[in-house]
Amino acid sequence: YPCDDPLYIGMYGWFGTPIDEMLKKADTIITIGLDGWDIIRPFKSQVPIISIDSVDVNDRTFQPVTQGLRGDISGILDFLENNIGQRNTSTEWLSLAKQSFNKIQDYELGVSTDYNPSDGIAPQSVYKEIRKFVPKDTIITADAGAHKSLASQAWLSYLPLSYFVSNGLSPMGFSLGAAMGAKIASPESPVISFVGDGGFLMYAGELATWKRLNIPMIQIIMVDNALTQVKSKQLKRGYNTESTSFDKVEYKRIVESFGIEAIEVSKVTELVEGTKRALQLNKPVSIIVNLDGSEYLRMPSAV
């Protein structure tokens, strides 16, 4: 769904508290192909839910549906479009949608007052700054990890098949192979793979395939020296984080050892300049982004 549509309010479940409130005020919720396994916060509401899907959805974690329409999704939607009369959207609802979207982008995804640029780039800024200048048809793949939750809200997609993420099992190491496939399938569109340092270390060997096939795309390696998705939960519970923290690794040297150009950045200006340069090079390029990983925990809807 295009993120610049006035009806778009954001993605439910990740860094989207205002959306929770809007859903509770709805007359009816219609879900289309919704896989509820990845919804982080339990959804409990008295609002009727109509599910349109090719499978039975009552075995999911979202909430038992009031009415399910099971079958060919596109056929069901075509039928409804042709048989339901045109309705004007409430101006009040449009205003609420805009407020919800703005609150997520400006507040929940905003940089905290404790952030210091000298500590690295705020992770939410990575997606926001790159989105400002890359073409609308840019395709991204988001790996598993804390940054994936950010990608769901901070990266604005405008076209179908331009945002790829592995839900459910969320395998680390997904993004590079997915990005290579996306670029082969859509050679005219810029393609960017986003991966955390943990995910990168799990599949660094795929760099050899990338180099051998010489696929012109960009890899963004988001470095905070931790498995933050798990580490954040350990911190909240007072657990030891030794197993989810690790020392700084020379990622630039690893990438270059495969014969791939690498750019390392620690400031937003460097990130913007480096990404623009990588787009112009039109060849395999990795950008190592040194983050202030503490920002993940400072955001209102922390991971």
Language model regions located:
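Conserved thiamine diphosphate
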Residues: M11, K25, I76, N82, ...
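Short glycine-rich anion-binding loops that position phosphate/pyrophosphate groups of nucleotides
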Residues: L34-W37, V55, G145-H147, G198, ...
